[in-house]
Amino acid sequence: MTDQLESFSLEVDAWIEEHCPESMRTPMPVSEQVWASSDINFPTTDSKTWFDAMVSKGWCTPEWPVEYGGGGLSFEESKILRSRLKFFGCRPAQINFGISMLGPVILEFGTDDQKKEFLPKISRGEIWWCQGFSEPGAGSDLANISTSAQLKGREYFINGSKIWTSEANKADWMYCLVRTAKTEKKQAGISFILINLRQPNIDIKPIKLLSGQSPFCQVFFDDVLAKESHRIAAENDGWKVAKRLLEFERTMMADLGSEGAVDVEPIKTYKNSKAIDAPGQLKLHKKIIKHEMRNHLIDLTMARTGIESKVGFSPAALILKYISTEETQTRWELNVTSLGAGGLEIVEKSQGPKQEIAKSFFYSKAYTIAGGSSEVQLNIISKHILGLPS
């Protein structure tokens, strides 16, 4: 590390000590997440203090240009910042799909006006974004979408339906794939459009799951309007934008568990637990050590992928999504095993580390489906990276 970067690291440490409340340096339960929104909700005073400090510094989007609400940091400085935030156990100041997925494609493909209109609001957490990709007839075969957008004057009239849209009933805007032309090659007639969800003719229906929760929705469009100026890239050229966004999504999915919801390292659960008998301890301990080593290798690969993605497509993003989500499931399985017979106990309205481990264990089963199932990822890897025949 250069003297300049060493000095920056010390500055970051001092800033965190001054601006990050102690309560924001503890594992974060789902109930205390701060979601970006036009009507943002802060569960505690400290969460608002931490949010305001990070936004003011531009460190929610550390590598974005300052004029767009970012911190203007170099890649190396940003890496140090993330490392020090993780070292102190700092909670993410906000949960924001705009930062992790949409913002990077606007930076890459958007016009100057689009960057000025959306990026500062994304960085400040003023918009809750949802993703309108999947449809009842287009899941893994995403290019099969049929939701149409017809340009009349300076506005698109959108008709159709999106499904499995996370938190659409809470979102302000949707970034959406629509069909703007019927072509022989399905990918050639797709456009990428930003849609304001706070308008008439949109019907959003939450989908109730077995758990009783409804994080997913189906969204119906009936002559819904979107400005032509809110189309990212040229008409019928949205597939390249979608592919790039999916790279960022897969990188985000690969990083699941390292920030956001409560993250509990299996080695800590193991050390604090008396539930495993002596014969089983050695075998479990070996599994945990192997898991920790794999996670370290994943972190190193993610750092390399971050550099590669600056200049274009990085095949490691596809591989990381598969490996990391599988490893995330392993993490929670090891946590549950360390707790013994009571590891999966869930008591209604009860809180605490044990509860969070059980909930995270169950939810982790979705990681290998969300953002593209593991089976689909393996197909893509075999065809497009390894060059194997279909």
Where are these regions (language model features)?
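Amphipathic, small/basic residue-rich leader segments at the start of a protein or domain
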Residues: M1-N96, E117-R124, A254, E265-K274, ...
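Glycine-rich beta->alpha junctions and the first turn(s) of the following alpha-helix
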Residues: D3, I202-I298, Y367
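C-terminal helix-coil-helix/basic helical segment that borders enzyme active sites and/or dimer interfaces
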Residues: M28-S31, A275-P279, N295-S350
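Glycine-rich phosphate/cofactor-binding loops in nucleotide/flavin-utilizing enzymes
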Residues: I80-L81, M101, W239-F248, M253-E259, ...
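N-terminal glycine-rich flavin-associated loop
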Residues: Q94-D113, G139
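A short, Trp-centered hydrophobic/proline-enriched beta-strand micro-motif
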Residues: G125-F133, L177
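A structural signal for short hydrophobic beta-strand segments in well-ordered beta-sheet cores
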Residues: T147-Q150
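A short core secondary-structure module
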Residues: R154-E155, N159-K205
